[in-house]
C-alpha cells in the first residue's frame, strides 16, 4: 500500500481547483443575497400596491410603519454582547477585568486565572460562531477586518455595556414601541376596509410581507458579514501560500490581483 494514495495528478491541480471553487462560492453567495433581497422588495411592492388601491393618498411613511419592527439577524451580534455584559456583572471579578483598558489578549489572560472568568470565556466562545463574524465596516472590503479576528472590537463594546449597566442604564434594543405603533397603524387602516374581498387581499399581502420582510436585513449579516469574513480568510490562506513560495510579500497582497490573474500566479 502506498501512502498517500496516488491520485494520478499533481497537488497543484487541487490548489487551482480550490481557488476556482472559492470564486464560484462567491457567485453563489450573492445569488442567495439577491434572492433574499429581491423577494423582500417584491413583497413590499405588492403590499404597497394593495395599500394604495385600498387607501388612496396613503403616505409612504404609513406603509413603512405597517411593516416595521422585524426581528433580524443583524441585531443578534449586539444582543450577544448585551447578554455577555449582563453575565459579566453577575460574576465575581469579571466586570473589573473587562472594564480595564488593556487589550483583549490581556483581558483573556486575566479572565483565565479565575473560575468565573473561565466560565465567562466559555460563554463568549459559544457566542462567537456565527455571531462575531461581523465586519468592522460594511463587509465589502477585505481590509476592514472582523470581530472574529480583532477581538478588541467586541471587548470594547462589552466594556462600554458593563459600565452602562453599573450606572443603571438599559443596554438592550427595544422593539416594543415600534411594534405597538405598527399594530395600531395596521388596525386603524384595516377598519377602513369595507368588503371581505378587499380585507382578504390586504391580509394576504400584509402577512406575506411580514413573513419575509426580515430578509431585507438578514441578507446583510449572512452574506456581507458572515460569508465575506470567511471568504476573505480563505483567500488569505492562498496569500500565505504565495508568501511562503516567494511570490508576494504579505498575505493581503493577493487582493491586488483579480480572479483571472491569481490562477496564473498559482500555476507559476
Segments from the language model and where they lie:
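Contiguous hydrophobic, helix-prone segments at protein termini
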Residues: 1-268
Amino acid at each position: 500500500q502506498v501512502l498517500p494514495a496516488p491520485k494520478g495528478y499533481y497537488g497543484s491541480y487541487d490548489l487551482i481547483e480550490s481557488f476556482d471553487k472559492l470564486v464560484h462560492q462567491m457567485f453563489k453567495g450573492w445569488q442567495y443575497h439577491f434572492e433574499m433581497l429581491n423577494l423582500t422588495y417584491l413583497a413590499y411592492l405588492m403590499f404597497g400596491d394593495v395599500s394604495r388601491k385600498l387607501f388612496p393618498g396613503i403616505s409612504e411613511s404609513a406603509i413603512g410603519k405597517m411593516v416595521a419592527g422585524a426581528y433580524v439577524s443583524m441585531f443578534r451580534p449586539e444582543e450577544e454582547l448585551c447578554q455577555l455584559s449582563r453575565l459579566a456583572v453577575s460574576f465575581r471579578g469579571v466586570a473589573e477585568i473587562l472594564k480595564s483598558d488593556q487589550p483583549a489578549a490581556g483581558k483573556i489572560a486575566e479572565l483565565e486565572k479565575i473560575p468565573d472568568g473561565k466560565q465567562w470565556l466559555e460563554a463568549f466562545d459559544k457566542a462567537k460562531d456565527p455571531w462575531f463574524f461581523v465586519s468592522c465596516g460594511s463587509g465589502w472590503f477585505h481590509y476592514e477586518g472582523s470581530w472574529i479576528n480583532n477581538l478588541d472590537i467586541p471587548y470594547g463594546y462589552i466594556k462600554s455595556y458593563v459600565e452602562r449597566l453599573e450606572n443603571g442604564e438599559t443596554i438592550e434594543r427595544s422593539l416594543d414601541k415600534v411594534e405597538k405603533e405598527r399594530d395600531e397603524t395596521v388596525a386603524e387602516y384595516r377598519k377602513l376596509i369595507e368588503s371581505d374581498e378587499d380585507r382578504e387581499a390586504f391580509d394576504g399581502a400584509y402577512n406575506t410581507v411580514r413573513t419575509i420582510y426580515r430578509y431585507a436585513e438578514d441578507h446583510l449579516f449572512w452574506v456581507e458579514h458572515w460569508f465575506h469574513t470567511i471568504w476573505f480568510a480563505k483567500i488569505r490562506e492562498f496569500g500565505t501560500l504565495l508568501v511562503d513560495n516567494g511570490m508576494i510579500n504579505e498575505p493581503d497582497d493577493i487582493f491586488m490581483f483579480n480572479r483571472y490573474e491569481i490562477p496564473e500566479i498559482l500555476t507559476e
